[in-house]
C-alpha cells in the first residue's frame, strides 16, 4: 500500500511539476529547431520533398501527431498481447 501511494505521488508530481518549472515558456518542437540548424549550416540547402498534406493549423497537426502515436501504440500492444495469449495457450496445452 505504501509503495503504491509513493508511486502515485511520483506520477502526480511528474504530471504537475512541468507546469511550474517553465511557466509561460514556448515549445517550438524539433522540426523548427532542425530547420534553423540546417539554415545555419547550409543556407543554400533546398528541401527535396514537400508534404503531401499540410494541416490547416497547429492544433490539427498536433491532433494528427497524437492520433498517429496512439494508433502505433495500439498496434504494438495488440501484438504483445496476442503473443502473450498465444504463449499462455501453448503452456496450458
Swiss-Prot record:
It is a multi-pass membrane protein. Keywords: Cell inner membrane, Cell membrane, Cobalamin biosynthesis, Cobalt, Cobalt transport, Ion transport, Membrane, Transmembrane, Transmembrane helix, Transport. Disulfide bonds: none annotated. Its main location: membrane. The chain crosses the membrane at residues 5-25, 63-83. GO terms for molecular function: cobalt ion transmembrane transporter activity. The keyword Cell inner membrane applies. It comes from the Bacteria. GO terms for cellular component: ATP-binding cassette (ABC) transporter complex. InterPro entries: CbiN (IPR003705). One of its GO terms (biological process) is cobalamin biosynthetic process. It is found in: Cell inner membrane. The keyword Transmembrane helix applies. Part of the energy-coupling factor (ECF) transporter complex CbiMNOQ involved in cobalt import. The complex confers cobalt uptake upon expression in E.coli; can also transport nickel with a very low affinity. NCBIfam families: cbiN (TIGR01165), PRK02898.1 (NF002780). Belongs to the CbiN family. Forms an energy-coupling factor (ECF) transporter complex composed of an ATP-binding protein (A component, CbiO), a transmembrane protein (T component, CbiQ) and 2 possible substrate-capture proteins (S components, CbiM and CbiN) of unknown stoichimetry. Expression of just CbiMN in E.coli confers some cobalt uptake. This is Cobalt transport protein CbiN. It comes from Salmonella typhimurium (strain LT2 / SGSC1412 / ATCC 700720). The lineage of its organism: Bacteria, Pseudomonadati, Pseudomonadota, Gammaproteobacteria, Enterobacterales.
